[in-house]
């Protein structure tokens, strides 16, 4: 495999080219990209956990250091002012020397407010990208050049197409997340609580709970019906029935986002339904290719959901086509088939149709779908279908003409298991689709 250093060199060349194009299009001289700042909790002297500006970590794998600045113009070597205070109260990260530092000019910044004297004197034509607009104004950046929409749309659109460096980082994040999922399943099988399963996951991945790319969803039994369940009960339930784990990892700022569901017993209806959702997810991925709308795959999976609802006699006396047409599959899979993945878990530009930011919304029937793009080589997406038993979504169907088609007795029997979700991370290539998750033998 090509070294990360050489992949990074090509990655920087790609970002430089995108920057040149963006600056020319929007008549700017350079971009000043801010890592961000610490923000204190209201009426407290304690800061919230730091989350770096994703446009900053696109350039350098510096994810834990506030008050850093990047100046890029697409021509000269990117210049990084790295915050390096003299501080005996807090940990101070050393000036980086790593695989990437040959391609970036790294300069120590001893004071957070010292950047003003180090920037070019003429700043009227510099664009600022970052979370603190008032800081940009203090530095003399024109208000119209603070997070300019056209520039950000342009950069976001091309972030959809991952460089080989980015894909290498995402494969490493997959390895970490897969280790976590294996440890979590073992913890579940040994009877641990959600809280303790989460600790096992974090230990296996080498993350703190503030470092994972999103809050882990560790859901036992009926908790699996809450799509973004993050409570973490300290007490294990008396009876273990099911376990849904939606948890990722991060490597050099790039995310993995995996979900698996396990049945405590292997010989019940729920276990068979888990197997069938898994099989249908793999079957859908096997059909994927460049040049097809992501929306089409979402719609296709509703047809697969209908097949499973019929097979398991959850919906009866109705054709699969009629189920989809009348949205009887909707309450069972209320979310989208997945989303773009990269520097952010729900990565940007899922609805952008071009580099001008033209927006194509999700279909009215499926408002929670997060991507309407035509799949193209270099894109990374999640494929995460599910079937859930959520009373608030099922309740409206208990009345009316379609109620008789719902096997309410079967649904009541499955509700204590919560739901099922299976999620892999895939890369679209010219002639194939790479399943980064299954390549690591995560069943």
Curated annotation (Swiss-Prot):
Residues involved in Mn(2+) 2 binding: 246, 257, 423
PROSITE patterns membership: PROLINE_PEPTIDASE
Top-rank taxon, per record: Bacteria
InterPro entries attached to this UniProt entry: Creatin/AminoP/Spt16_N, Creatinase/aminopeptidase-like, PepQ_N, Pept_M24, Peptidase_M24B_aminopep-P_CS, X-Pro_dipept-like, X_Pro_dipept
UniProt KW keywords: Dipeptidase, Hydrolase, Manganese, Metal-binding, Metalloprotease, Protease
CC cofactor note: Binds 2 manganese ions per subunit.
Record-given protein name: Xaa-Pro dipeptidase
Gene (UniProt): pepQ
């Amino acid at each position: 495999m090509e070294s990360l250093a050489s992949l990074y060199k090509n990655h920087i060349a790609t970002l430089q080219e995108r920057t040149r194009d963006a600056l020319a299009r929007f008549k700017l001289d350079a971009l000043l990209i801010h890592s961000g700042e610490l923000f204190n909790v209201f009426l407290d002297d304690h800061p919230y956990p730091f989350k770096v500006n994703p446009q900053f970590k696109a350039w350098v794998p510096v994810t834990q250091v506030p008050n850093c600045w990047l100046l890029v113009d697409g021509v000269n070597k990117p210049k990084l002012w790295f915050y390096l205070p003299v501080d005996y109260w807090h940990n101070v990260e050393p000036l980086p020397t790593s695989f990437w530092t040959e391609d970036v000019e790294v300069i120590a910044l001893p004071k957070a407010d010292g950047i003003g004297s180090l920037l070019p004197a003429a700043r009227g034509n510099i664009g600022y990208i970052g979370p603190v607009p008032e800081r940009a104004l203090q530095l003399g950046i024109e208000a119209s050049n603070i997070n300019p929409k056209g520039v950000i749309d342009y950069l976001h659109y091309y972030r959809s197409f991952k460089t080989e460096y980015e894909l290498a980082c995402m494969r490493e994040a997959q390895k970490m997340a897969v280790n976590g999922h294996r440890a979590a399943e073992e913890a579940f099988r040994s009877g641990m609580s959600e809280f303790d399963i989460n600790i096992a996951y974090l230990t296996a991945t080498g993350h703190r709970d503030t470092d994972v790319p999103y809050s882990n969803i560790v859901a036992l039994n009926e908790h699996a019906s809450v799509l973004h369940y993050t409570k973490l009960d300290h007490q294990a339930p008396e009876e273990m029935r099911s376990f849904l784990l939606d948890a990722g990892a991060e490597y050099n700022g790039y995310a993995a986002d995996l979900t698996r569901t396990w049945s405590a017993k292997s010989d019940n209806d729920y276990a068979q339904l888990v197997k069938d959702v898994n099989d249908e997810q793999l079957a859908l991925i096997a059909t994927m290719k460049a040049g097809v709308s992501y929306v089409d795959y979402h719609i296709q999976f509703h047809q697969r959901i209908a097949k499973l609802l019929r097979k398991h006699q959850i919906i009866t006396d109705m054709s699969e086509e009629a189920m989809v047409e009348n949205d009887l599959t909707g309450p069972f899979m209320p979310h989208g088939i997945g989303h773009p993945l990269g520097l952010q878990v729900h990565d940007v530009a899922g609805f952008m149709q071009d580099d001008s930011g033209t927006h194509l919304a999700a279909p009215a029937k499926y408002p929670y779908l997060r991507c309407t793009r035509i799949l193209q080589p270099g894109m990374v997406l999640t494929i995460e279908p599910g079937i859930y038993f959520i009373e608030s979504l099922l309740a409206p169907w208990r009345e009316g003409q379609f109620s008789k088609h719902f096997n309410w007795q079967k649904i009541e029997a499955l509700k204590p298991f919560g739901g099922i979700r299976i999620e892999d991370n895939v890369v679209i290539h010219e002639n194939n689709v790479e399943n980064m998750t299954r390549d690591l033998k995560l069943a």
